[in-house]
From Swiss-Prot:
Entry's induction text: Up-regulated by the nitrogen regulatory protein C (NtrC also called GlnG) and repressed by RutR.
Function summary: Catalyzes the reduction of FMN to FMNH2 which is used to reduce pyrimidine by RutA via the Rut pathway. In vitro, the flavin reductase Fre can substitute for the function of RutF, however, RutF is required for uracil utilization in vivo.
Top-level taxon in the UniProt lineage: Bacteria
Catalysed reaction, written as an equation: FMNH2 + NAD(+) = FMN + NADH + 2 H(+)
Additional observations: The Rut pathway degrades exogenous pyrimidines as the sole nitrogen source at room temperature but not at 37 degrees Celsius, a restriction that is apparently a consequence of an inadequate ability to remove toxic malonic semialdehyde at the higher temperature (RutE/YdfG function).
Name by which UniProt lists this protein: FMN reductase (NADH) RutF
GO MF entries: FMN binding; FMN reductase (NADH) activity; FMN reductase [NAD(P)H] activity; riboflavin reductase (NADPH) activity
EC number of this enzyme: 1.5.1.42
Lineage, broadest ranks: Bacteria, Pseudomonadati, Pseudomonadota, Gammaproteobacteria, Enterobacterales
Gene Ontology biological process terms from the UniProt entry: nitrogen utilization; pyrimidine nucleobase catabolic process; uracil catabolic process
């Protein structure tokens, strides 16, 4: 059996462009957030998406206990916020760097996000070092910014909506 080594896998995955998201939660275990690109649609019936979260991450206990989250998809120009939520910055400083609303689940919803998906975690599957969080979408909020943001080849890239 051919086993792919970790670095080869990571290098190959860098070729897959993905939206940049800040995943947030709030509840009995407190407010927390992190940057993620491992987010995707599962089904539209019922509307469900998934988020992958490392069980060794400092935010894991909050998401595991709160069982709610908001996927805030970033737009171009929000790279500094992505970097802030992707580092070791204390939570209160992360959240102080942007304007937030409270979503229907009680999770922080980024006011300037391209789109926000407010969710309840409906199922968790553990694979290797990560939990795959299946999330039932309870509300969606869209913003009208024309520029998206993707992570590709280990750097940020802006995307522009085509003119209609």
């Amino acid at each position: 059996m051919n086993i792919v080594d970790q670095q080869t896998f990571r290098d190959a995955m860098s070729c897959m462009g993905a939206a940049v998201n800040i995943i947030t939660t709030d509840g009995p275990a407190g407010r927390a957030g992190f940057t993620a690109s491992a987010v995707c649609s599962v089904t539209d019936t019922p509307p469900t998406l998934l988020v992958c979260l490392n069980r060794g991450a400092s935010v894991w206990p909050a998401f595991n206990e709160n069982r709610t989250l908001c996927v805030n998809t970033l737009s171009a120009g929000q790279e500094p916020l992505s970097n802030l939520f992707g580092g070791k910055t204390p939570m209160e400083h992360r959240f102080a760097a942007a304007r937030w609303q409270t979503g229907v689940t009680g999770c922080p919803q980024l006011e300037e996000a391209l789109v926000s998906f407010d969710c309840r975690i409906s199922q968790v599957v553990s694979v290797g070092t990560h939990d795959i969080l299946f999330c039932a979408i309870e509300a969606i909020h869209r913003h009208t910014t024309p520029y998206g943001l993707v992570w590709f080849d280990r750097s940020y890239h802006a995307l522009m909506r085509p003119a209609c």
